[in-house]
């Protein structure tokens, strides 16, 4: 069994974020002692101190996958605002609907530059081979962290598309006024097998409005406490 953890914070410098990652890793190790547990990280050595035995997955690959422009930054810079935004949406659509094609484009770009994107391959292999996706504790599904949240939600959908169970631990949901974030969350979160919340006052109602079933939501508190 292979479990992939998306910790949201990839440098592991924030004490609270690091504690939530440690708790998630420890619980998974106790439940599945034979599993291979991978963690997306910018700091493999720090990860090894926090979670001995965890396999690092390069966050650089994650960053390239979600941020790299298939038609090149130079073209984006030359386009006027609306055209640039439209091209960006088209590239995002390619990644979401046809990830194999998007991967091929990135690998071709890397080969032409003679810098094959090893990190992208390792990241996508981890996503494609995992038997479960776990999103670590965070208060990221909210307007101030919308760019990060949208990438996490896309990961949730990618796993769900493969029939892989998804669990989100220690989540703070909302407030959300950003329309793109709301639609992204409403598309992804109902597909999760479990969403554990930090609090029970606002989060359950927000999730219910998004179409998340009550039997998939638990109020567990903050994993760092």
Regions found by a protein language model. Name each.
Residues 1-175, 216, 224-225:
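Aromatic- and Gly/Pro-rich donor/ligand-binding loops
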Residues 111-120, 172, 178-225:
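A nucleotide-sugar donor-handling region in carbohydrate enzymes
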């Amino acid at each position: 069994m292979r479990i992939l953890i998306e910790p949201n914070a990839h440098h592991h410098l924030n004490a609270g974020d690091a504690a939530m990652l440690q708790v998630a890793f420890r619980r998974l190790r106790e439940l599945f002692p034979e599993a291979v547990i991978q963690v997306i990280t910018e700091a493999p050595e720090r990860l090894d101190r926090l979670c001995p035995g965890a396999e690092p997955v390069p966050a650089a690959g994650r960053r390239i996958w979600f941020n790299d422009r298939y038609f090149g930054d130079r073209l984006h810079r030359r386009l006027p605002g609306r055209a640039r935004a439209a091209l960006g949406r088209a590239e995002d659509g390619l990644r979401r609907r046809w990830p194999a094609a998007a991967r091929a484009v990135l690998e071709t770009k890397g080969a032409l530059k003679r810098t094959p994107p090893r990190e992208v391959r390792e990241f996508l292999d981890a996503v494609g081979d995992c038997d479960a996706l776990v999103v670590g504790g965070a208060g990221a599904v909210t307007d101030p962290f919308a760019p990060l949240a949208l990438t996490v939600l896309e990961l949730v959908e990618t796993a769900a598309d493969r029939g892989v169970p998804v669990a989100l631990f220690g989540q703070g949901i909302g407030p959300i006024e950003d329309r793109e974030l709301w639609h992204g969350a409403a598309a992804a979160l109902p597909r999760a097998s479990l969403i554990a919340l930090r609090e029970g006052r606002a989060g359950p109602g927000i999730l219910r409005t998004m179409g998340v079933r009550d039997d998939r939501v638990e109020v567990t508190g903050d994993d760092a406490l």
